[in-house]
């Protein structure tokens, strides 16, 4: 079988993934539910995973890492939990529905939204994004790799833009985290 939509659902997984899931289902308990060997094993595994991911993404504090069931839930949590009526958010034309739908929902609740045009080559237009910044702008929300064009956003540049203006940066790295070898291009 030739499966061409791997980035969306990752149909074929390495055997080690199946083995780890089977082992977890067979031997682990619920983290934080007591001091049994199974519960402590689950807590230890979560701690180690949190530390590994923090190191991978260059974080400084693994306790600040939050696990969700998937990227869509994480994006919804960040977008719906961060903005209040009157806040302004900038996103791009390149975004996936997992970013756009919660932003539209927040817009109905009084959050101001600007969707910046993309450049001619289907990448983020940094000039358009910077021109959209206002006094009440709180964040830029953008994808690292567009599922529309396949192009990458220059995240170090986007991060510098956000820092320069004191903005939060929410990155949808669903298509690239763990795939792009240079994590510094993601964060």
Please describe what each predicted stretch is.
Residues 1-185:
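Pyridoxal 5′-phosphate
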């Amino acid at each position: 079988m030739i499966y061409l939509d791997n980035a969306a659902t990752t149909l074929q997984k390495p055997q080690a993934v199946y083995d780890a899931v089977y082992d977890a289902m067979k031997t682990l308990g619920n983290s934080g539910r007591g001091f049994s060997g199974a519960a402590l094993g689950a807590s230890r595994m979560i701690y180690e995973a949190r530390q590994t991911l923090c190191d991978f993404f260059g974080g400084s504090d693994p306790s600040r890492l939050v696990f969700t069931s998937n990227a869509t839930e994480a994006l919804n949590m960040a977008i719906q939990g961060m903005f209040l009526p009157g806040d302004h958010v900038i996103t791009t034309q390149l975004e996936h529905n997992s970013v756009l739908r919660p932003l539209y929902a927040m817009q109905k609740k009084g959050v101001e939204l600007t969707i910046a045009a993309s450049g001619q080559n289907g990448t983020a237009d940094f000039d358009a994004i910077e021109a959209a910044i206002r006094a009440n702008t709180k964040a830029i929300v953008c994808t690292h790799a567009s599922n529309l064009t396949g192009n990458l956003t220059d995240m170090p540049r986007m991060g510098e833009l956000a820092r320069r203006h004191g903005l939060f940066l929410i990155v949808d790295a669903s298509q690239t985290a763990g795939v792009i070898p240079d994590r510094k291009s993601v964060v």
